[in-house]
Amino acid sequence: LSENGYSVISLDLYGRGFSQNLNDDYTDELFANQVIDLIENLDIKSVKLVGLSNGGRVISKVADLKPELVDKLIYVASSGFRVVNEAINKKVSKKEVNDFIEKNYPTISKGQLADFKYPENHIGWDVKYEDLLKYKGFARALISTRKNHYTMDRIHVKIQNSDIPVYTIWGDSDNVVVYKKFEKRIELILPKRKEFFILESGHLPHMENPIQFN
């Protein structure tokens, strides 16, 4: 995008990448306020927000909290349109963290290759994920994020009733966020959206078919 003349800002959300692993509840509101704080500190008046996977939930929440900042919403393989069985107890215990690490850490990096339709074209992607496992608090962040999910229909109806343009982009072979499971629901809550399917791609269509995506 930057090569095509766009001004682009990307960030690692709390608990991801090189951002701080907070000892806090990892809610959509926490992430949204992180984005809002960055926008306001940079004195940016309006932004086009792109949210990938769980990032789709985050940009929806930004639009809920600060709609005046949002010029467009672009959802890429967003996980935010599914019905969620909300957790009653949202706290994360040390046992849950230890169990998660023991059960998932040996294979979690290799599992990232399942995001692709053609993982053989992305050798080494799993190695990059290994770096995240080195940071204290990463497992807790993943668990807390999942526990704080809820069904976002109210927010999406609010967005539908606003003047914010909405775009949804999907890989045609995404096995992580399966479009067929919520196809009818998204049509009911966001009928004005413009929708695109990227051919020959899984959960990361911008990486597998960048020519069509761009």
Task: Set out the residue ranges of the language-model regions.
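Catalytic nucleophile loop
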Residues: G51, G55-G56
